[in-house]
Amino acid sequence: MLKHISSHIAMGCPQDECSICWESMPSGVGRLMPCGHEYHLACIRKWFHLHSGNRSCPVCRTEASVLVDTDHEVKIDLSVGQLLDFYGLLDEIGSQLLAITLQDHSTQDDEVNEEGLAEQRAQLTLVQCGICGEMNGDIDTCCNRCHHMYHHSCLGQLLVEVNAEREQGWSHCIFCYEQLVPLYISGARRVLSLQDRGVHRGRVRNNRSILTELIYERSGVLVHGIEDQHASQHDINDIEHSWHLLEQNRQRKQLEYQDKCKIQAHVRRILDHYYHCAKVTKAQYTFINKKVSQTLYALSRGVYPAVDLDYDGIAKTLILDEMEKLSS
């Protein structure tokens, strides 16, 4: 399978499916150089996060030096050292990152307030939801204390999943329990403005995570900043149990992608046999892999390995069922 994909690329043929998730790639494609293999940007970002320090192509194992966003023809240098600070990194790849600019700094005289300028530059950062990890303009809620940000819909979904009452935490940060406030976003300028440089899921990243967490892709979002409001106090003890459940669910979600990769390995191992025997086509392989893997995700109930599941046995049974349906 890998040799087939490699030769396909070598002949100059575009890939129609991501070799990590086996889904189509109509957009959001990243190409590794020099090997030329293509993946969903989100998939290759997660792959590199799971294999920290390893920049090898998942298909051919060639060391990648550049990742190209094919939608925008943006090239990202993957060899930038991890010891560079955040602004050094921006200087290194700034010319490649679409139109990222700092806020205008204007004064009525020729004197420059260096302290004010430094404070202004420190606001150039990026936004990521503390629950789902996505970075987009739909993030609408933030915490003034720890600076985590969320989609309002993600907060609601978490409460539903743990059977918590809406008043028990709908409007509070799941990390520090502070009451959340609206995050005002405008598209007037192409600036990302946050207030923290720590490295944490759902927070600002100053070190080099892959593509600096796709900062160039989201460079059209301006966060005007978080209003200096004093959140009202609340009784943490009343919702302590809910927060415990929410934190458990958050940790489970962080492991979910890794677990899915492991579960898919069971499915692909069996499917590879049928594919090499020419019993399933490439399209059928992709369809069956996705459907059977999703069934195993559901059966696992967020835990891998589930002690009561024979993954290989169940995968084989489900695969044969799907093959029979496709042949009828």
From Swiss-Prot:
GO terms (BP aspect): ubiquitin-dependent protein catabolic process
ZnF RING-type span: 18-61, 129-177
Gene3D superfamilies the UniProt entry points to: Zinc/RING finger domain, C3HC4 (zinc finger) (3.30.40.10)
Domain of life from the UniProt record: Eukaryota
GO molecular function, a single term: zinc ion binding
Listed InterPro entries: RING-type_E3_ligase_ATL, Znf_FYVE_PHD, Znf_RING, Znf_RING/FYVE/PHD
Alphabetical keyword list: Cytoplasm, Metal-binding, Nucleus, Repeat, Zinc, Zinc-finger
Protein name: Alcohol-sensitive RING finger protein 1
Designated gene of the protein: ASR1
